[in-house]
Amino acid sequence: MGLIRHMATGDGIGTPRSSVARPCARAPLASLILLCAVCMWCGCGRPSRPDAAAGPVPKPPGPQWFADITEASGIRFTHRTGTNYDMPDQVGSGIALLDFDQDGRLDVYCVQDGRGGAGGRNQLFHQEADGRFRDVSAGSGADLAGRGMGAIAGDIDNDGLPDLVVTEHGAVRLLHNLGGGRFEEIAAEAGIDDPRWAVPASFIDFDRDGWLDLVVGNYVDHDPTQICHDAQGRQDFCAPAAFAPTSTRIWRNVTGRRGAPPRFEDRTEVSGLTRAPGVALGLVCADLDGDGWPDIFCADDGRANRLFINQRDGTFREEAALRGLAFNAMGRPAANMGTAFADCDGDGLGDLFVTHLTEEFHSFFRQDQRGLFTDSVARSGLQDAGWRGTGFGAVFADLDADGWPDLAQVNGLVRRATPGQTPVGDGVDPWWARYAQRAQLFANDGTGRFRDISAANPAFSGEALVGRSLAVGDLDGDGAPDLVTGNLGGPVRVHRNVVPARGHWLKLRLVDPAAGGRDAIGAEAVVVAGGRRHWALLQPATSYLSSHEPALHIGLGKDPGYATVEVSWPDGTKERFAGGTADASVVLRKGTGTRATP
């Protein structure tokens, strides 16, 4: 099985301011995990750096949900960025999980800030048969040296191999997967090169023609000569209010034939997206109004969020305020950054979580009826957490497989902290240590309410980092969702799911043979088990600058099997598939189920 298999307003990026498991089966890895835990608590080689805003020191652990296996994994990546208060320096550090060579094992792609004063290139890590990761960046063509932000994975030409889109300050890059571990950058040839500041991105089949289209959220119209200061007159990072908003962009995939050179056409103007510019840091592309056509939600930094509803004719209409997604529970715009989307209360409707600044409450938009949302953070339990960070990457995943999605979130400040005494993680650039905060973990109690269990999980929440990206995927193939975090000015962290006494589970891959066998991004599934209907959406590009494993992880709790799976494919067709026993990974292929009535 291999090594890993056994092993309110505020400042900064946010709102305007005045200055314009399973136990390890092999003893060596178990010993390594125990040693890492001892080092964490004894402070082996870990200095304490000042940062009062990092969050409370976790209590001694009981049964933990994660083990930090970064060292054992073989992934060696440290994000480097500038230290001169240039605004793009505090935005990036994306992570993408993908199986680029289709060998059945997840690989990891890490985005670097190659032009932010520190140099460096993006890195691609291949998972070997023994479960360790090997750096295969050199010679792959994927080792870009731009001012990187995030990355998403998806098969743009229906050849069965996932490609990569990388967003940068001043560019959108397209890495076409040629096979054999080789990528070619073809953004200009494909028609998606763009000089704006691209941050989030997502694939979407907005016209339901079987080809993945591309949405890119641009941030601000950045002027690098603009200098900003804090309330004390010290130079500081500019807030987005210092610059003009920009338009989210959409490109239609017009490749048309498998094996043809990938081609896109810019549909931004005709789609209507330019009528509502914004300051996008997060995206969710999903059918949010229940008509079977994918829509576009933009989490906007310091402004009202935008929701573009698909009009089924190639155009979109902005309806965020109408549907309850524009403002927070106080009726105000907030520092909207990271996103997570899942059915948290079991009513069959997706709920939307959006992260904010430390001094703001995060938003938990519960979908009360199809297409209408209410910020219900007060009754979600998330507002009751003992401590609140400046949130970026966030994921809903059923980490303990009890049938209810839990929430993981990484945090990192956007303005310097008041000096204090809390430990900052190894490898964090000392200049960035004052922006470090702990990650948080929340358990779903089975009613859609969440309980903060961060203090009992120091392997995930015990050290302060400048958290940005957070990607979820089953790295070791044991059916349990693992986590990979990307940290500004610091190292990537790999966290293996070791939840004791996990429930039963089902992992689904939804693929379309007519589209080269690629993952059916945008598909929805309902797993019927034990009298419950577990709804899930296949959309890897949520969180913050991240791309998750393109699979659905369904916790079944005590149910040893499932009765049926109902799939709504991106083109609007619906199929029903027979059930089976739990604790299995299953591939469902479009066209092989029983046709269901829409």
Predicted regions and their residues:
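Hydrophobic beta-strand segments that make up the repeating blades of beta-propeller
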Residues: 105-112, 159-168, 214-218, 291, ...
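Short, conserved, GDST-rich strand-edge loop motifs in beta-rich repeat architectures
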Residues: 111-119, 218-243, 410-434
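Beta-propeller blade termini
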Residues: 85, 91-102, 126, 147-162, ...
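Gly/Ser/Thr/Pro-enriched helix-cap/hinge segments flanking short amphipathic alpha-helices
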Residues: 45-50, 58, 62-65, 435-440, ...
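Blade-edge beta-strand/turn elements of extracellular beta-propeller
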Residues: 66-69, 132-141, 182-192, 261-273, ...
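Repeat-based blade/solenoid architectures
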Residues: 75-94, 140-152, 191-202, 244, ...
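C-terminal motif of bacterial Sec signal peptides marking the signal peptidase cleavage site
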Residues: 41-43
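Asp-box/WD-like beta-propeller blade repeats and closely related beta-sheet repeat scaffolds
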Residues: 139-152, 167-206, 220-241, 245-247, ...
